[in-house]
Design a protein with these regions (language model features):
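Glycine-rich phosphate-binding loops of nucleotide-dependent enzymes
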Residues: 2-174
């Protein structure tokens, strides 16, 4: 039987915020095609783990591997390697339009036609964003900002998509 290599592997990850240990020995393997949910109480370290994977918070120890290779420590390098994060809390670029926010997420892509194709895919997932494409992100509702944050993360065509509190502010379609 052939052994599969995880697309993403987190091994014994430790993250400290000053004297406070936010993560102690967290480990996780994610294989291609899997949907994985990390569940825990508030303050358990779920967001910290995602931010450490992205290189947004320093790790005290442990390894993070993508396809068996050590992941860089800088977030722009992590995105270029194939991982995107839609962070908790609707972090959008408020003074930019919806289209400009989506362009910011597409920085790893160099082909303009590929960028436009990605925008079309985002607009298929979130038709409301197409209606608001020239509107400033800061004037969108909370749910629309959440859609934009997820759409922006998808623009890089990630192989691994991390979603932190993805349903925050989203209303069910009635």
């Amino acid at each position: 039987m052939e052994e599969r290599t995880p697309i993403l592997s987190v091994k014994d990850l430790v993250v400290n915020y000053g004297a406070i240990q936010a993560l102690k020995g967290a480990s996780l393997d994610v294989y291609a095609g899997e949907i994985v949910a990390v569940i825990g109480a508030n303050g358990a370290g779920k967001s910290t783990m995602m931010n450490a994977i992205m290189g947004d918070v320093p790790r005290a120890s442990g390894e993070i591997l993508l396809d068996g290779k050590l992941l860089p420590h800088k977030s722009y390098q992590v995105v270029s390697a194939g991982i995107s994060l839609s962070p908790e809390g609707r972090k959008v670029f408020a003074p930019l339009t919806v289209l400009e926010n989506l362009d910011m997420g597409a920085f790893p892509l160099s082909d303009r036609s590929q960028i436009e194709k990605q925008k079309e895919e985002v607009f298929q997932l979130f038709p409301r964003l197409l209606e608001r494409k020239n509107q400033y992100a800061g004037t969108l509702s909370g749910g629309e900002q959440q859609m934009l944050a997820i759409g922006r993360a998808l623009m890089a065509k990630p192989r691994v998509l991390l979603l932190d509190e993805p349903s925050l502010g989203l209303a069910p379609i009635i």
